[in-house]
Amino acid sequence: MTAAVVPLVAEHDSWITVDPILGCPADCAYCYLGPLGLRAARPAVRATPEMVVAAVEDYLCGRRAGVIDPATDQTPLCVGNYTDMVLTRPNREALVRIVALLAERIPRRPLVVVTKGRLDPDLLAAVDGHGFPIYWFLSQSLGRHAGLPLERGPIADLDTTLDNARLVSRTAHQKAVHFWRPFVAELRQSRAELETLVGRLATADMACSVVVGLTRGPGVPTREERLVTLLPESMAAPAGQWEVFDEEGWTDARATALAAGYPLYRNTSCALAFLGGEPEALGTWRQPYNAHRCLPAACPLVQRGRCAVAAAGEWTDAATLAARVAAYLGLGAGQVSVTAGELVIGDMIDEFDYNTLLHGYGRHLAIRAQGVRRQKAWLGSFTEGGLAA
C-alpha cells in the first residue's frame, strides 16, 4: 500500500475512516505511517472539510446503503487515521469544521479521534456543541515512562494524557479511552506500577483502556532501527506472528483492572460498545475470538449482559439478506448463503467489504469468506490476513 492509494473514506475494522489529511509530525517507531512515508511528515491537505463531508454522504448513501441503512447505522466515523488531528493548528481547525458539517448533513452517530496530542478546552468546547458523541482514543504506550524513546515529536507524556482525560470528562458529549499500544514485554509494568497506573487512569475519568500489541506484517516497519534495538524480544518473535503481545503482562494488567473495577479490553470495538451502552458490533464474543479477546477482558457484567443478548439472537430473513449481500458484492445468488448463524460467501472478498458486512451483521452472524484481500497497511484482528470460510 502507498500513500497515493489511501481512500478518502474507507471501512476499517471498528469504524469508517475519514482521511482528508495525510502525514503526521510525530515519529513513532512502530507506526504504520513509516513505510508510507507519512511519519515525521508535514500534514498535507488533500480535501477540504466540505469535500470530506460530501464524500462521507456519498459513501453512506451509495453502494454501502444496499446492505446498511444510513438513517439508522451507528458505525463510528474516525477522522484522521493517517495523521494526528490534534498535533497541528490546521489539523485542529479542520477537525472542528468537519464535525460541524457532519452534524449538519448526516444523522447522529459516534465520532472517533485517535491522538497523542495535548487537548485544550477550546478545542473540546468547539466540537461538543453539536450533540455527536465523540470518543477520544488517547494513545499512550508508556514508552517515555519506561525510558524507551520509541516516540519523537510533540506527543503527550503520561501526565498530559491523564490531563486530557480530565478535560474530556468535563464535556457533555465526549469520552476518553486509553489506547495502550504497543503492549509488549519491554514495556511491562510491575504489579505495583500497574496498580498505581490503573488507579491514575480511573481517577482521571478515563472510561477504559484498549490494549493492543505490536502489529507486524505488510505495511508495518519491522526493520525500523529503534524497534530492533529497543524491542529486541518482541522483534525476535516468529515471522508468522502477526501481533506480538505481552501475555504475562496482560495477566497482571487484567488482574489489576478487575480488582479496581476498571474496564480493560483487547478490541477497540469492545470499548466502543461499552461507551455507547450497546452490544459489541463485530462478534468479538463469538468463536474463535472470544477465547483471546472477549473472555479475558476486564469487562463490566452489565456490558457482558448486553453482548449476551446479541449472542442469543437469530437472523430470521435469510433469503432476503443473502440476495442483498450477493448484489452488494456482485456475486451470483448461489454464492451467498445464511445458515446456522453464519453469513457465508463462496468467494474472496475485499477487506473493506468484509468490514462493511461485519458492521452491518457481525452482531447477528459470523461472516465467512473464502479469503480476505488486504486493503490497508495493517492487519485487523478479524481478518488477520484472510479469514477462511
Explain the meaning of each model-derived region:
Residues M1, V6-L8, H12, S209, ...:
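Generic preference for hydrophobic/aromatic residues in regular secondary structure cores
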Residues P7, G219, R223-A389:
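C-terminal accessory extensions appended to soluble enzyme cores
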Residues T48, S190-E193, D317:
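Alpha-helix capping and helix-coil boundary motifs
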Residues V53-G62, G66-S234, G240, G249:
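Conserved AdoMet/S-adenosylmethionine-binding subsite of the radical SAM
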